[in-house]
Regions:
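C-terminal membrane-anchoring or membrane-association module
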Residues: 324-332
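Start-of-domain marker
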Residues: 21-75
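Bacterial N-terminal signal peptides that target proteins for export
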Residues: 1-8
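Mature, soluble, non-transmembrane domains
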Residues: 57-319, 326-327
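C-terminal motif of bacterial Sec signal peptides marking the signal peptidase cleavage site
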Residues: 16-19
Length: 332
């Protein structure tokens, strides 16, 4: 499990924008009467916690698909099932329906609550909020209007800062846990305070040496200090290592959230007018959404559509015809 998560975080450091790998797909269908149905299509994910009120679609043998119909989008949002390490990803949804005689307009929005507290290292002194958001989600588009050469010059330094933060995120988990158990170490090369002050230096060392943290997690700190004093947390088979690994899992919420890829499909009644950040294909609005979009704040999905009230046109036509007939009758 740890090796798998390290692999994911290492990939994060090398990527600007991750493609929408569908481990959990969300499908929301809005009906004309304001009711809605939520679907979750799941493949090899432990991020969905659904109770017996959800129905499983047994026809899908490749993925697990569950669904539930709600009286309103508010009720839908009040029943979350997506979670990271047991903490639900909450949302608030709203549907505005406006009758305009010939048309009925629908405006839908769903705002997913921020998980900014999952970020385990400070980033403000390395990257601005917009820069980190750009690296995580592509928004805001900081390269708008740039030429290809200008984009390359802009991305290079930004990528270096991003890789530093990604590496620090990996190392920081170990440093904090070791510091919490520093009294277990026999003859440490430095005291606890000094040890914690070296996080930047250790991170730079890992980057300069191109250290393979994935395969040699236990060797980095020992190689940096040229000491085996910290090996009790990695190499022993006793309770110290087990306790260390159990606590370590709790520090990886950032990785779990980042890797939660949840493409969001939205079906609205009538003709789609506005898709927000989504793209329209075959009448379905597709949003590339996932946990990383929540690392720096709330994330809102918006869309609007229009239903043509055919009966209103027919009725209006009949009224016009009756009015004309009445006028002609009076003149006759």
């Amino acid at each position: 499990m740890l090796r798998f998560k390290y692999c994911i975080l290492a990939a994060i450091a090398a990527l600007m924008i991750t493609s929408c790998e569908k481990n959990v797909q969300i499908i929301t269908e809005i009906n004309r009467d304001g009711t809605c149905t939520r679907f979750y299509s799941i493949k090899e994910s432990d991020n969905v916690y659904a109770d017996e009120t959800w129905v499983e679609d047994t026809a899908d043998t490749v993925r697990t698909t569950i669904y539930r119909t709600f009286n309103s989008v508010g009720e839908m949002a009040a029943n979350p099932v997506l979670a990271v390490n047991g903490e639900f990803i909450n949302s608030q949804a709203q549907l505005d329906k406006k009758f305009k005689w010939f048309y009925t307009d629908y405006k839908f929005s769903e705002t997913f609550a921020s998980k900014e507290h999952f970020i385990n290292v400070p980033f403000a002194d390395k990257m601005s909020r917009d820069e980190l958001s750009f690296m995580l989600t592509g928004y805001p588009n900081l390269t708008e209007g740039m030429t290809g050469a200008e984009i390359a010059d802009f991305i290079g330094p930004l990528q270096e800062k991003y890789e530093y933060l990604a590496t620090l995120s990996m190392i920081d988990c170990d440093l904090r846990l070791i510091a919490n158990h520093y009294d277990m170490i026999a003859n440490p090369p430095v005291d606890r305070t000094t040890f914690m002050s070296l996080s930047d230096s250790i991170t730079r060392y890992a980057l300069d040496e191109s250290w393979d943290i994935l395969r040699h997690r236990n060797g980095l700190i020992q190689d940096y200090f040229k000491s085996d004093a910290y090996s009790i947390f990695y190499d022993s088979n006793d309770d110290i290592k087990d306790e260390f690994e159990d606590e370590y899992e709790g520090y990886l919420n950032f990785v779990d959230l980042y890797y939660l890829i949840t493409p969001y499909n939205l079906k609205m009644p009538g003709r789609i007018i506005e898709t927000g950040r989504g793209t329209l294909k075959d009448g379905v609005i597709n949003y590339c959404f996932g946990g990383k979009y929540l690392l720096l704040g709330d994330y809102t999905i918006t869309a609007s559509s229009r239903v043509t009230n055919v009966w209103a046109f027919i009725l209006s036509g009949l009224i016009v015809l009756l009015a004309l007939a009445s006028l002609l009758y009076r003149r006759g």
